[in-house]
Amino acid sequence: HCVLVSILRCNGMVGMAGAADAHALIVSSSRLFTNYRHTSNALLVYDAVRRFGLPDDRIVLMLGGDAPCNPRNEERPSMYASMTRDLDLYPRDVEVDWRQEEVTVENALGVLTDRLPDRRVSSPRKRLRSTSQSRVLLYLTGHGGDEFLKFNDAFELAASELATAVRDAFRLRRFSELLLLIDTCQASSITALLHDAALMRSPPPPPSPAGRDHAATTAASPRIATFASSLVGENSFSHEVDSLLGVAVSDRFTFQLHAYLRRTLVPTSSRGRSAAPAVDPRLSELHKYLARSGRLRSTIAAEASGGLSHAPAALDNMSVHSFFGAAAQTLRIVGTPPTAAAAPSTPPPTGATAPTYARWATMESRALW
């Protein structure tokens, strides 16, 4: 590892990875096996951020359901997002930080703001270690309605509560930019308040009861981009039903999001030439991809505000790589033929094709973090 890090430092890769201070909070708010797809949605995003090289100590995964180990899961403990079963979303190294009854409105917002009492946090991994320089990805999925997201089929996260928590997190120096992805019915009703300039410029929050207050910032408003899977009055739809399990296994918005993200990691050129993402990684292009897919049956709402100019111009200047990690950037170097100046720690598999080599290079890059 020392040799590998030395090689990367010579090529400027360590500094680039360090600059990409990305963190992720991924929340599935539903319980019960019938909500299998919500757990699967969260695991799809978890898989994506890990493919991009984000280490588990920068990811907080909250799963309200027990679908992986539920007796009704004929494939337990595996989880799949489609009937093809080409990707197990629950590998042995998955790290779930908050489970089932722990996944509450209070805990989810407490992780975002880092205002949880010590007695409730049994492990440091349950905290989001972001700073004022961090870009934070917040993903939410579950059952929702007009200005609310249900938790554990009994409680509700109101849109006003989420907006207040995001504002407080910013003033407590928890992020510099935030990307919110939400997959639920009437999702845009939950994101709308995040772009209310008057609300987001409200005074700083009171001192934390946990005694761990960060210095408050006086910046005007947080820089936020949001993607909502549906408009007010619209439903979000499941992707497909697995006949063996008898339930829907993923939702269309998140399934297509995951497909887009995976394509940004696959090189378009053959081995021996510089690799480039197969699709444009800008958030504006993600919006176009989702809006034009024709498979969602709902309308995508994308917006940016705060220190950023309003969409679509702001989305043009933001990349999914900024929020999901730096591996997609390092792949452009790691994916080139091994040389004395820049080589992975081990040679590629003999006879590897370009996609196979890309997967190998991505696995190599994970060891860096």
Predicted regions, residues:
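Cysteine endopeptidase catalytic domains of the caspase/legumain-like
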Residues: 2-369
